[in-house]
Design a protein with these regions (language model features):
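ABC family nucleotide-binding domain
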Residues: 1-169
Length: 169
């Protein structure tokens, strides 16, 4: 993981002020949990950090590198942030096997085949889902699908891993 710092983040959806002056620092090696009732901004916070949402105010750095500066309308692309987000819905490709789902992003990065295979099998082993490698998402339980989504996120060796509703299954 890396040091991440958010300062004075504001996010609106229309007139709805979802994130109000959010400031937090997560140090390298920390584990942080966002707790709160439905609709309080937990998922929005993850989406801002990951680059899927742009706040109206505030800044964010990862390891001292600016990722968000709303005043300057600067927003680093999600692919430049060195992180992965596992969605509550898992977002698995239904027409791809577990192998293909986990390997997809690694192929997009144009990694060598032997490196893709190494990372694939390491992620499968870490999540204890080796026996599902040739199955499709609809052949898996919700908990198994969740582990595939986490394995896919871990396979790219992110500096930061964001999990939305990780205990839902």
């Amino acid at each position: 993981m890396s040091r991440i710092e958010l300062k004075h983040i504001d996010k609106y959806y229309g007139d709805n002020h979802v994130l109000r002056d959010l400031s937090l620092t997560i140090e390298d090696g920390d584990f942080m949990t966002l707790l709160g009732p439905s609709g309080c901004g937990k998922t929005t916070t993850l989406r801002v950090v990951s680059g899927l949402e742009r706040p109206q105010n505030g800044t964010m750095t990862i390891d001292g590198v600016e990722m968000i500066n709303a005043a300057d309308a600067y927003y680093a692309e999600p692919s430049k942030r060195g992180l992965n987000l596992v969605f509550q819905s898992y977002a698995l490709w239904p027409h791809m096997t577990v192998r293909e789902n986990i390997s997809f992003g690694l192929k997009i990065q144009k990694l060598p085949k032997d490196e893709i295979e190494r990372r694939l099998h390491e992620a499968l082993r870490m999540m204890r889902i080796e026996e599902y490698i040739d199955r499709y998402p609809n052949e898996l339980s919700g908990g198994q699908q969740q582990r595939v989504a986490i394995a896919r996120a871990l396979a790219s060796n992110p500096k930061l891993l964001l999990l939305d509703e990780p205990l839902s299954n």
